[in-house]
């Protein structure tokens, strides 16, 4: 098992910067605003042959009794319980604070080994920076710089030397990865908690509470899965803080990293243009899609009918997706939603045999041929699979550039029904067999081979005739002269 290291400390001491250093990524948002990383964030790292997990926590505010900072403190304590080792970060520039002392008191009660790291120590005297932190009674302080990497390697190496070498493992198998997307405050984190059965993601009544995209691994019926809880995507004009701008980018990246996108809508609000925009982004990315209409239990029957009409009118392009009307707070409809997520993943990663694809194509053409485009009728010869996530079918033939969009939709529906491709986009590509010399300029120039060879033969024949004539003139003797002698 890989050891798990939790990064703990008060706000703005450099935990996210150190997280990025340990994972060699920029997964955690880094900004000079206290309390920016408001949830646990998981990452992978490796020193030599020893891999490890890292948990980046929100800033620990142990003296706050209510509000979102209190929720962040509870999340931090849960991260400590999950970890195998704890790195307690303090700020070497600011020095020792009363809040550091309170956090140290909490950590001394934990059975986990705690390593004290004095961050932002670049350019300073290590002994001077570490001196005042001996008061915390957490062992030898490690002076590091998360931004520049000074001392980080030796800190992690010391932590990992207390854990055995990992056994050889097989390559990680591919498994479903779901990105939970949607506008702010529609219940995405509540839905993730309902699926997982625990309050792993902060769900607070504040739009944009989850600013980072949280990757959460879990198992269901013995199979591994990963859920990505993205930051709420705001309308561009409402993204005022630089932090929220970063979060929108993270949400888009999460969709790219996922197999399936779960679009969460709020039944208590009208279907907005931004809902369609977010769905369109997932569609353009080629991701399988499941739609969860949340807060369904809190609206009237009349409102429900109105929501369904709005969905069919504004989200008409999601005809391939499965819609679920759920209540994440009361955990209603979660099982059916998860079944559709699994089905969408299976459809996105399907492998279709070429003979069957070609038979389906020939059956579709036999039932309805593509319409003529002028004097030309497209001819489809065979088809094969060209990719997965989303599935791509490549059709080969002649004059396929003349196929209309309506006929492409007909083929899409035919293939979707034949292979049960529910929940995933399906792309059809046409590979046209064209004449490479269709343009006159591209045609090769004909060489006058016969004409050249014929003229050569004529010249040779005429030459032989002339040579004969010359020989006859030289050897011709008169008969009379012979007898007269």
UniProtKB/Swiss-Prot annotation:
GTP 1 binds at residues 9-16, 56-60, 119-122. Residues 3-167, 176-349 form the EngA-type G domain. SUPFAM superfamilies: P-loop containing nucleoside triphosphate hydrolases (SSF52540). InterPro entries: AAA+_ATPase (IPR003593), G_ENGA (IPR031166), GTP-bd (IPR006073), GTPase_Der (IPR016484), KH_dom-like (IPR032859), KH_dom-like_a/b (IPR015946), P-loop_NTPase (IPR027417), Small_GTP-bd (IPR005225). GTP 2 binds at residues 182-189, 229-233, 294-297. Residues 457-469 have a biased composition (Basic and acidic residues). The keyword GTP-binding applies. Residues 435-485 are annotated as: Disordered. One of its GO terms (molecular function) is ribosome binding. SMART domains: AAA. Pfam families: KH_dom-like (PF14714), MMR_HSR1 (PF01926). GO terms for biological process: ribosome biogenesis. Residues 350-434 form the KH-like domain. Keywords: GTP-binding, Nucleotide-binding, Repeat, Ribosome biogenesis. PROSITE patterns: G_ENGA. Residues 470-485 have a biased composition (Basic residues). Belongs to the TRAFAC class TrmE-Era-EngA-EngB-Septin-like GTPase superfamily. EngA (Der) GTPase family. GTPase that plays an essential role in the late steps of ribosome biogenesis. Associates with the 50S ribosomal subunit. This is GTPase Der. It comes from Neisseria gonorrhoeae (strain NCCP11945). The gene is der.
